[in-house]
């Protein structure tokens, strides 16, 4: 609670300190002709009233004549947003006498509709639970605060409370700011587009890591390496890379590259002799010309394509792009599979974009620790800092200009045209 004290000079009160009220509260202070101020007294059982359905263009001085006819006013406060300063359409009213509050409630509550409002005015006792039932305590050292948490958290139930005492460290300004923005986004029925854009990529990445782990474990134990498993893992990485670039990737099926090419009769796979290869892989029987059988190289019945001209496009090479990173896991017999396939498509860097004229915002007083992610999260309820229409930009300015972060308030305004000669 902050108390404003009147200053005294030469034994007389300084009326200048009483005439100005920076908080916007209007109370019942009266001034005698001699300059001395009389502080009003209120009953010990005075009622604090909540006033709702007030036009947003009416301030304390406009509302005071309406309520003064029921008695002397002790305090009248119009509620405004602490960050934007916007009128909330409600107020708190306290009379000096309890009877005045009861008369005002009986005469006004849902009995009179103020100009510009669709519903009648609400006059009722303020909720005593509006304080939130919480408080902040600041210690001189972190150790003292930790000792208080250890001693008091959950140790007792205060009189009138329904649960035990909760003592914990308060959120930082940055955490509170992010939570308020998330709540605002939820109230506006909005969602995070980043989760939609990269949700599929997260699933692909998780499946890719699991597939890689299974392949490496199989090779380490000397087991058989199925080329189709390697192709499936390469497919996941290929689709993940394409999704990150915003491209649609069609999944590869086992029949796309594993079936026999048209016009080729699948010969019988020769019998495999006893293991003589490396890491437990079986040897490959040699043909008369000294070359290994194609069927043994491409196991599981995957057959090679016939020789083509250098200019002809190989559909197998296009379908299995991105398998080269798995070459280290293959034995020598499988090395030529990865050599024929190119690298996956690189990530396409996103260039900085600007919206149309009148839709770009310039923001002052951002904390140094705020990056693109925090800035994006703050302005997600409005689209982003650059909008595609002036109406969204104006809505963001009205809601975010003056928003407090830490010890400073944001200053949000339209970006000046490029031909303006004045700096920001």
Curated annotation (Swiss-Prot):
Name the residue ranges with Polar residues bias: 9-24
Query: Which cellular component, as a GO term, is one annotated location?
Result: cytoplasm
**Which organism is this entry from?**
Xenopus tropicalis
Instruction: Write down the InterPro entries for this protein, in alphabetical order.
Output: CELF3/4/5/6_RRM1, Nucleotide-bd_a/b_plait_sf, RBD_domain_sf, RRM_dom
Tell me the Pfam families matching this sequence. RRM_1 (PF00076)
**What's this protein's name?**
CUGBP Elav-like family member 4
UniProt main location, coarse: nucleus
- Cytoplasm as UniProt keyword: yes
Summary of the function given for this chain in its UniProt record:
RNA-binding protein that may be implicated in the regulation of pre-mRNA alternative splicing.
Q: What GO annotations for molecular function exist for this entry?
A: RNA binding
